Swiss-Prot record:
GO terms for biological process: asparaginyl-tRNA aminoacylation. Its EC number is 6.1.1.22. The gene is asnS. InterPro entries: Aa-tRNA-synt_II (IPR004364), aa-tRNA-synth_II (IPR006195), aa-tRNA-synth_II/BPL/LPL (IPR045864), Asn-tRNA-ligase (IPR004522), Asp/Asn-tRNA-synth_IIb (IPR002312), NA-bd_OB-fold (IPR012340), NA-bd_OB_tRNA (IPR004365). It catalyses: tRNA(Asn) + L-asparagine + ATP = L-asparaginyl-tRNA(Asn) + AMP + diphosphate + H(+). Homodimer. Keywords: Aminoacyl-tRNA synthetase, ATP-binding, Cytoplasm, Ligase, Nucleotide-binding, Protein biosynthesis. The lineage of its organism: Bacteria, Pseudomonadati, Pseudomonadota, Gammaproteobacteria, Vibrionales. The keyword Nucleotide-binding applies. Disulfide bonds: none annotated. GO terms for molecular function: asparagine-tRNA ligase activity; ATP binding; nucleic acid binding. Belongs to the class-II aminoacyl-tRNA synthetase family. This is Asparagine--tRNA ligase. It is found in: Cytoplasm. GO terms for cellular component: cytoplasm.
């Protein structure tokens, strides 16, 4: 018995007249007056289901085949034949249909309807991958993930597993989830009345990580070129289409590198993964272009063929001021540019992806390298047409005295970062890196307007179901 994924049958990998068994779920069943049933069967391997033509002379035709409903799982054996119908080249002439699992009540099955709102699907996140849209998102997400790993492997980078539990705040923002095994009903206290974290599991305050960057720096200062790719957590009370409490980050870190080096790396990586998804998941992208965002494919094709523009933050602010545009958020030097500012630069002024560099130090993190002007740091953001910021990065401050001064300036005790300071004490080197929010990348590729719909089980304020 040869089991075959639906994708292999539909793509023509298997010869006509060969006998195969496909395993999957019923998308739909249609019965003809001629005593034939047409089953649309999907297994997730590709966007399209395969049509199985089932004759009424099968032993279980009346008592099982005619009772199949959306969601039932089946194994169908038959011969691959050329399809006379429009839409696909091959179908299955069934000789055996085995029902593996029934849907208990077809009337109340949450996925019974052919179309559901995106909002409704969030309420049934455990079932939503069975839909066309979320199934396509999952395949695109996988393709992008594999392409990222492949890109860095080909470039000679080592993947580093950054810890999820940390005592460090990489962003200095303080919006962190605390990790504790203390009894919340009976907290141990110090003489001063504060919670005594010496009694906790790790003997100190610990949190879920907001970034793997600091740990990646340690490994870059030994392996030269590394990257992390894993979940990160922010306790931001933000109910927006761009924010999640749990999301994935891609964070390369490069020793003996400056800001321009990682700016080029960011451009090369984005173009590489976009080319990969255009080649490998064309069927899913065509669905997104048809149903979600008409520009889904065009946007990616234009992106990979564009030369990135580069502009200093100070010049970008002047461009915004000279535009004559009335923005919702006023423009002045020193602001952290909002999405409307970023999109104006990428979509209307440069009409291409743009890298903005050298931001004011007061709106950036403590670890970013101070520029000679004393006002700006060697930071960058990559702005993409259609979404705005998609990558943020910087050259790291490798000079211990400057790093210490910067931490004190921002209210961070250097002694609490002693291990991070050691990287500057023992063989310091210029190094740089960036962070890519993976869900924003998936959202950009698919055209899905909300990051809650491009991660399997979204974690947001007041919501941690499933």
């Amino acid at each position: 018995m040869t089991y075959a994924p639906v994708s292999d049958v539909l793509s023509g990998k298997l010869a006509v007249d060969s006998e195969v068994t496909v395993r999957g779920w019923i998308r739909s069943r249609r019965d003809s007056k001629a005593g034939i049933s047409f089953l649309a069967i999907y297994d997730g391997s590709c966007f399209d289901p395969i049509q199985a033509v089932v004759p009424n002379n099968l032993n279980n035709y009346d008592n099982e085949v005619l009772k199949l409903t959306t969601g039932c799982s089946v194994e169908v054996t038959g011969k691959i034949v050329e399809s006379p119908a429009q839409g696909q080249d091959f179908e299955l002439a069934a000789t055996d249909v085995k029902v593996v699992g029934w849907v208990e009540d077809a009337e109340t099955y949450p996925m019974a309807k052919t179309r559901h709102s995106i909002e409704y699907l969030r309420e049934v996140a455990h079932l939503r991958p069975r839909t066309n849209v979320i199934g396509a998102v999952a395949r695109v997400r996988n393709c992008l993930s594999q392409a990222i790993h492949r890109f860095y492997h080909e470039q000679g980078y080592f993947w580093v597993s950054a810890p999820l539990i940390t005592a460090s705040d990489a962003e200095g923002a303080g919006e962190m989830f605390r990790v504790s095994t203390l009894d919340m009903e009976n907290l141990p206290r110090t003489d001063a009345g504060k919670v005594d974290y010496n009694e906790d599991f790790f003997g100190k305050e610990t949190f879920l990580t907001v970034s793997g960057q600091l740990n990646a720096e340690a490994y870059a200062c030994a392996l030269s070129k590394v990257y992390t790719f894993g979940p990160t957590f922010r306790a931001e009370n933000s109910n927006t289409s761009r924010h999640l409490a749990e999301f994935w980050m891609v964070e390369p870190e490069v020793a003996f590198a400056e800001l321009d080096d990682v700016a080029k790396l960011a451009e090369d990586m984005l173009k590489y993964v976009f080319k990969a998804v255009l080649e490998e998941r064309r069927d899913d992208l065509e669905f997104f272009a048809q149903r979600i965002d008409k520009q889904a494919i065009t946007r990616l094709e234009q992106f990979v063929s564009s030369d990135f523009a580069q502009v200093d933050y100070t010049d970008a602010i002047q461009i915004l001021l000279d535009s004559g545009r009335e923005f919702e958020f006023p423009v002045e030097w020193g602001i952290d540019m909002s999405s409307e500012h970023e999109r104006f630069l990428a979509e209307e002024h440069f009409k291409a992806p743009v890298i903005v560099k050298n931001y004011p130090k007061d709106i950036k993190a403590f670890y970013m390298r101070m520029n000679d002007d004393g006002k700006t740091v060697a930071a960058m953001d990559v702005l993409a047409p259609g979404i705005g910021e998609i990558i943020g990065g910087s050259q790291r401050e490798e000079r211990l005295d400057v790093l210490d001064a910067r931490m004190r300036e921002m209210g961070i005790d250097p002694e609490h970062m002693s291990w991070y300071r050691d990287l500057r004490r023992y063989g310091t080197v210029p190094h740089a890196g960036f962070g890519l929010g993976f869900e924003r990348l998936v959202s950009y590729v698919t055209g899905m307007g909300n990051v809650r719909d491009v991660i399997p089980f979204p974690r947001t304020p007041r919501s941690a179901n499933f």
